[in-house]
């Protein structure tokens, strides 16, 4: 829930779709502020936010079921534009007097939309009489329209694929414009918020920076502030915002648990101490962490051990400073959204960062969460606004438990060193191939498999690694980026391998 009032807001009502966050990201990309709220609290949110327009999301539910989710009637009484997506279209029709039935022919995946009429919703992208690819995912279908609606788009299995009441500015689409598989979907959503709702593109990270800094100053006053700096983008951007707001009232603590990427600790320390003059305490606790993980093979127990030790070390260092009144935390908007239950109602508490969970209560600190209204891509833009280098902002996501979670079995310094080096080699080759920025995430995993061989007469132990890569473009609704077959061989080229006298060979 936003703590700041934005005059031009779009309200997104979430009926439980897996891709609702993508709707919000597309609206934010159009430089318009929006909030996602679960349908259970939509009435309250509508009164509080007074949005200029509303988007109704998809849902796994069926409007034909008794007790299925509905949009607040106040939305349709307010005289503001409404866009229903998939289930959102269906519930809008059902609530306004139309009819929805369970379909015999379900429509999932790529489909083709035939544009029947020109509309402001299609301005600049689709014209009457043309056909375009969209992405469908529905079983139910609209079978009759409420008064005032007309059909402006059809598909072979959805005769009411796009409907409109142009007078009241109500629109419904049976497909999902928020996913990349609808190529013009983002532009369609832009048309809704800019042309139909009439909201101007005023949501920028420059404006957000000013508001966030002022909000931190107001919250903190003359209090003492600490921040757990992990070296990741989120905590770094949060720390810079806090430092801009309160200066030397802030002290950052970086706990080196020995599980970070190659040269990461040194890079973070140099950047924040030398470039930003940010008060930073570096704590080398690697022996403590690695010692506790040495005989542990269960990934969940590893994560909990790391979390527990982090709290212990951070708490010890914070007490050396004489305690603090506030703790800066890099909570993001998805953390807030994901803390809401769509079966039991909104959660009272917000999901804590895995590393600092429990610290505010134990040390009687108040949380400062300057990023809680932002998505990850917006945090990167804010980081750029704050002057963080592109090479830092664009780094791939890295898990809180670090390399320990990519090292099956017990953790040792030798295993970590092998994995750290292999990961660096892999990412170096990804960069050389010009693929780093196209891939959301790529990393090496040390497999618990070994064999022996000889290389030029030298006996060696061969350690097997898995090279993984995630979806491309940071889209999270995409797929895997195919690599050339010879790419893994390049990563294992002899010029990357240490002398067999000193290091095992990695395959």
UniProtKB/Swiss-Prot annotation:
Q: Where is the active site?
A: 86, 176, 178
Q: Does the keyword Repressor apply?
A: no
Task: Cite the GMPS ATP-PPase domain residue spans from the record.
Answer: 203-395
Alphabetically ordered keywords of this record:
ATP-binding, Glutamine amidotransferase, GMP biosynthesis, Ligase, Nucleotide-binding, Purine biosynthesis
What Pfam family is a match for this entry?
A: NAD_synthase
**Top EC group:** ligase
Give yes or no: UniProt keyword Nucleotide-binding: yes
* SUPFAM superfamilies hit by this protein: Adenine nucleotide alpha hydrolases-like, Class I glutamine amidotransferase-like
Where in this chain does the record put each Glutamine amidotransferase type-1 domain? 9-202
What Gene3D superfamilies does the record point to?
Answer: 3.30.300.10, 3.40.50.880, HUPs (3.40.50.620)
Q: Which GO terms describe its molecular function?
A: ATP binding; GMP synthase activity
Q: Name one GO cellular component term.
A: cytosol
CDD domains of this UniProt entry? GATase1_GMP_Synthase, GMP_synthase_C
Q: How would you summarize the oligomeric state and partners of this protein?
A: Homodimer.
Protein name in UniProt: GMP synthase [glutamine-hydrolyzing]
The organism's taxonomy opens as:
Bacteria, Pseudomonadati, Pseudomonadota, Alphaproteobacteria, Hyphomicrobiales
